[in-house]
Regions:
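Beta-strand/loop edge motif enriched in small/polar residues
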Residues: 1-255
């Protein structure tokens, strides 16, 4: 019942099922071992949890226009898609591990009122020992897109004849080295996917003063990304933090 994919060498890479939970080593996904093909994470029966030892980065972090062009990435949907089934729970062991949806990639995490999708820490989901207000138990989420940012230079008017003067590839907060990712562009209509009935809790990390991982960081995320019924609970720094873009929210609770 565990998630699997076929890597570039033709090998089938799959999580290990222990009878209840699915466990994924860094050989499945981690910083420097990004997911570069479509991946579906199923719901597990009997309270099963998807436990990741490494970070889950979807798509590649292209730092400049030449890299984006070589990869054929110009908008959301050009890269791999992460699909998470309703009722699934995903967990990570510490706050050096987190989730990135890179520009061009998309996440479709669509839960229901009775079966939400949960992103949390193993201390919460597996050990059951997380305090209600504990933070920094795992990193959190970063979702990037090609939306407009005031950190880039444009001509014209937003929503009319806007055009970039130069490249727009902004390093996202909360990461360095292999953990780095980038956001920004001139496409406020970009789509990074859909989050609905999603819970994110016990997150956060500080890389430097004023440079943190939040519950979810949205970098240049466009308005065609659908976000509805989102709950972010017990997070270090901010529940959500917006860096440019034009995404809208319907029903958000931050506790």
């Amino acid at each position: 019942p565990c998630a699997s994919y076929v890597n570039s060498g033709g090998q089938n890479i799959q999580g290990d099922f222990d009878g209840t939970h699915c466990r994924y080593s860094p050989a499945f996904a981690d910083a420097g071992n990004n997911i570069t093909t479509d991946l579906t994470i199923p719901s597990l029966e009997n309270g099963g949890v998807h436990v990741f030892e490494g970070s889950l980065f979807v798509g590649e972090a292209h730092a400049n226009n030449a890299e984006l062009a070589a990869a054929g990435i110009i908008e959301g949907g050009d890269g791999p898609t992460l699909t998470i089934e309703a009722g699934a729970t995903l967990a990570w062991p510490d706050n050096t591990k987190f989730v990135i949806i890179n520009r061009g990639s998309q996440i479709f995490a669509v839960g229901t009122a009775d079966n939400p999708i949960t992103f949390t820490a193993t201390k919460d989901a597996i050990e059951g020992s997380a305090g209600l207000e504990e933070v920094q138990l795992w990193g959190g989420m970063v979702v990037n897109g090609f939306g407009v940012s005031n950190k880039c230079e444009y001509t014209g008017t937003r929503g009319n004849d806007l055009a970039l003067v130069d490249e727009c590839n902004i390093a996202a907060e909360g990461a360095e080295g292999l953990d780095e990712s980038y956001y920004g562009g001139d496409n406020d209509d970009d789509s990074s996917g859909r989050l609905e009935y999603v819970i994110v809790k016990h997150t956060g990390a500080q890389v430097a003063n004023g440079d943190e991982l939040n519950g979810i960081s949205f970098g240049g995320v466009g308005r065609n990304t659908l976000i509805k019924n989102l709950q972010v609970y017990s997070t270090y720094d901010d529940g959500i933090e917006m860096f440019g873009g034009a995404v809208n929210f319907e029903n958000f609770v931050g506790i």
